[in-house]
Structure formats: C-alpha cells, structure tokens
Amino acid sequence: MYVVNYKQGGYALVSADKRVQAPILALIDKGCFNINVTKNDSLFLFFARKAADYVRKEITTYQDENGFDSIGVSSIEKYKNVVNTLTKTLWTDGVPFNNYCKVSGTKKRAKAGCAAIATGQIFAYYKYPAKYNGHDYLWNEILSGEKQPTTEKGKTAVAYLISDIGRLDKTRYGVSSSATNVTNVKNALNTMGYNYTYEQNPLSFVIYVNVLRSHPVLISATEKSKKTGHMWVIDGYADGVYYIEYYNYNTGESARKEKTLPLVHCNWGWGGQGNGYYLFNVFDMQYSDPHKTRATYNSNISAYVNISPKK
C-alpha cells in the first residue's frame, strides 16, 4: 500500500497492487501522513492492518476470476449517493471533556473513554437530552466551538455530559486509557431517552440508509483478544465510482465494468485526527486475514443504528 499526501492538505491510502479492485482505501480530510507520528497511532495501524487483510483477500479473488490476463483499474472518476458529514464536533477524550472523570479511589483525572466521546458527539448532534442527573446540558454553549466549547459554561456542561455518559455505560477509568463493554452503551442510550437498534457485522447499505436519513451511527471494533478496541462515529457516506478494464490475450476479449466503492466518513473521536472517508469493505468480516497469519481487529464489529431521540 502507498500513502499519498496532498498539497492542499489531507492524504490517501491506496493499494499498490493492480489486482486489488479498489483504487482508494481511505481519504483523510486534513493533515498529512508522517511515519514517525503514525507508528504510534493505534487508529491508523488498526485500519492499515484491516486494509492489508482486505488487499490479500482481493488478490486471492482476482487470481481465481474469469481467466483474464490483465486488468486495469481507473482512479475514482465521480461520486454518487453522497451524504455530507453530519456531525460538526471534533472531540477527544482529554480536557475539558474528562474534567469530571476520575480514576476510582483517587483524585487523578482519567481519560474520558472513546465510547463516551462517540456517544456524546451524537447527543450533541441531536442536542438532546436537555438535562440529566441535575445537570443542564447547555447545547448552544457546548457547541460554541468545533473542537471544544469556547465558554466556561460550555466546558462545564460538556464535562458533566461525558461524565454522566461514562457512569451510565460503566466506563472503567484509567489515567492513560479508559474503556467499557460495547453493550454497556445501551444503558446510556436507554436512560438518556434514545431509540436505537444494535447490530453485529452491519452492512454498508445499513450505514448508508442511516446517514441518508440524517442518523449518525455508533460503530465499534474489538481485537480478537478482546483486550483492546475502539468506538467511533460514522456520519457520512459516498459511493466512489471507478472502472475496471479486463483483457484476455488468447481470445482478444475485453470488457469494461463500472464498480463502486462504499466509503464511510469516520469521526474517530481524536480531535479530528484521521477523520475522513474509509472503504467500508475493509471493516467487513469476510475480509479477515485468509492466511491466519496474525491477529488484527477482525472480529466483533458492531454498531448502534437507527439512533434518534424518543422526544
């Protein structure tokens, strides 16, 4: 795989093998790729490993197809079924969001946890509920800034919001990282007054229908060992259209086929770092490593879809 930095900002992850029938694996909105920074970026490494599994699967499939001798893959020529990014927040699990998140039995400030941040960003999208546990969620104040509130009232309100969600989803707090079980998020959604459907191994069509109806999706991926994982928000969609040229040297037969790539916009909950459009097939469980050479985040993909306030 190659990583391409763009002069205007942002970068792309692309396949280096023409047998992979997907010219783009990921399009990141902002920033640039720096190997010295990225080698410690678990989010990028998570996706890169999944993308490598997808590439191996595609190569195996290509070698078994149709008897064609050569193949040419175009770049993405257009997009269709585009749903622009729904959420406008770029939150992270540090200050001020974790101001009231404490390590049990201590006064040490903990990380807020990815589940609370992802859930909180969806609550902020709907500006609901108005209050809980005696805390007023001043949504206009909370949303006064993209990365964090610009007012003290907003910072206090969002810190209460994230702390309340953390208690409801039973977040286990730690100084360097915090975590919870994916199914615990149901507690926060139920208590805070939300409808939802919980699905394992969701299809890209389900994601598309949700964002088309202006419903962001909570999605999570867990490593096989179940010791690490991540929850984030999918809040946009686009089908990238490209073309494949086939040619058979023996028969002279050629064919040109239109293909589409389901690209989902991911808000990772890291202050905007890595946000962008990612090939959803990479998250699909059928593209787990066919050679079983190593463990990756290739199990326990699940999502909360059809999220909306009950009001």
For the regions a protein language model found, what residue spans apply to each?
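Active-site-adjacent substructure of cysteine-protease-like catalytic cores
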Residues: 1-8, 195-263, 267
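A domain-level signal for caspase-like cysteine endopeptidase catalytic cores
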Residues: 171-178, 185, 189
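A diffuse structural propensity rather than consistent per-protein peaks
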Residues: 138, 178-181, 203-205
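Solvent-exposed loop/turn segments at secondary-structure junctions
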Residues: 9-10, 20, 109, 120-121, ...
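Active-site-adjacent structural segments surrounding the nucleophilic cysteine of cysteine proteases
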Residues: 23-175
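Noncatalytic regulatory segments and standalone regulatory/sensor domains
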Residues: 1-3, 11-80, 247-253, 259-261, ...
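Structural recognition of the beta-strand scaffold that forms the well-ordered cores
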Residues: 3-5, 12-13, 26, 113-124, ...
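Extracytoplasmic/periplasmic, Sec-exported soluble proteins
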Residues: 6, 106, 110-111, 115, ...
